[in-house]
Amino acid sequence: MALSLSFIICHLSFSVACTSNDEDDIFDLPASQRLAATIDHARQVLRSAEYGWEFEYYPSATLAYGGVVYTVKFDSLTANVGCSLIADSTETSYYRLTNDNGPVLTFDTYNSLLHYFSTPNSDEYEAKGGEFEFVIDSIADDLITLYGKKTRNTMYLRRLTAAPSEYAKKTISIFDHFVDSIRGTIGTAAIEGKCNPTRRSINIVSGRDTFDVHYTYTDQGIRLYRPLRIGGTSVQTFSLDTLSNTLTCTDQGAGNVTLQGIPYASNVMSYPRYEADYAMIYGTNDTAYVHLKPNRLEGTYIMQGLSPKYDLVLRYDAESSDLKLGAQVIGTYNGNQVYWSTVNYRNGSISNIQIADEGQFTLHWNGNRFYPRLNFTATDPKESNLVNSGLLIYLYHDAEGNLTAGLLSDDEWLTNGSFLFDNLKSLNRKGRLEE
């Protein structure tokens, strides 16, 4: 049974494709009652899924972040949401089905997973182009088509056939085993493609033609945002064989398309390889023991262990395969923002204090699998921007209203009893690096 909504003019004009006598009766109702019946039907279908739905979500009108699959289980008032790229992640929040010139699904109470791309911060006042209101375009038992009210991006709810935790486990495995590049033939066209795993995009070249395609990871492989037609053949959905590194198209009419994935070279630090325990070496003879934990949703790493009060965020650079560490807000102290700032520290003197995240440090692997080390270097070596250390500061307004920086000396925030990480040298990995 399928119920399709096609918006022809504004307000309440739409057509309904029906497959039962009960649905035929809808045409005999006033427009407001027809819409109410449609919303009621949508609610019934949403709640009917035993395991919930995989929500194929694309933030940003430019598709700058590719897509992300959330898992969503609906009851009468709330939705239990998980992210397929974050293990054991679930949050429950309220949702609504409303009328705004047609049926709209709204997640209108805060959910840190689902609202990640739509929540602004000090560096992104417009957030990441995400949204939480979705116009329902069509409804079938196993597939609901929506589009973002703001971006107009097409999105899908697909009925899950297994528990969300199992779906996430398989999807994370696909992410961690994904390839550096692809090559092969689609239809009559030879193609090569370079993958960006954390931005979920592939730059495909075929002869003189170039295609930038965006995708979501699934529990089987990847699904492109829209079908790619090349060499007379359309492809969209692929399964990944992690042993042979092959991507096989599962779309009807394209089952003979198999692309060869090229794994990362052994001398390249792909995103998943950074996860480990490390000893941070700095100062004259100082060591702090930390753990790098992946955040696959962001394509970043979380450095844990410096203090119970904060963690640091490191960005993965897909082009260089390095990590970038910049100045960043890490919390509040007595109502004032606290920064892990980057500075230049020489002979007891501090200069070049920076509080904006510009990836001031590059962490580059030394190339040794048996004694792996990530060396700190200044990303910008110019003297005016040179940094070599980290410093805990907080910003406050003095008696005259001037914005002033103070050194944070509260013991709970300190590492090895100090607010200064002078002359950062390296992160020395615990254990060897597997191929």
Model-predicted regions and their roles:
Residues S60-G102, A190-L224, A288-S341:
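N-terminal glycine/threonine-rich, aromatic-flanked beta-hairpin/loop signature
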Residues E23-D24, Y110-H177, G187-A189, Q220-P272, ...:
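Beta-sheet ligand-binding and adhesion/scaffold domains
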Residues R158, S165-H214:
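Extracytoplasmic/periplasmic C-terminal soluble domains
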Residues P103-N121, Y289-P294:
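Short solvent-exposed strand/turn elements
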Residues F14-A17:
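C-terminal motif of bacterial Sec signal peptides marking the signal peptidase cleavage site
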Residues T19-D108, I139, T151-N153, T161-G184, ...:
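Acidic/polar, low-complexity intrinsically disordered N-terminal segments immediately downstream
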Residues M1-L5:
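Bacterial N-terminal signal peptides that target proteins for export
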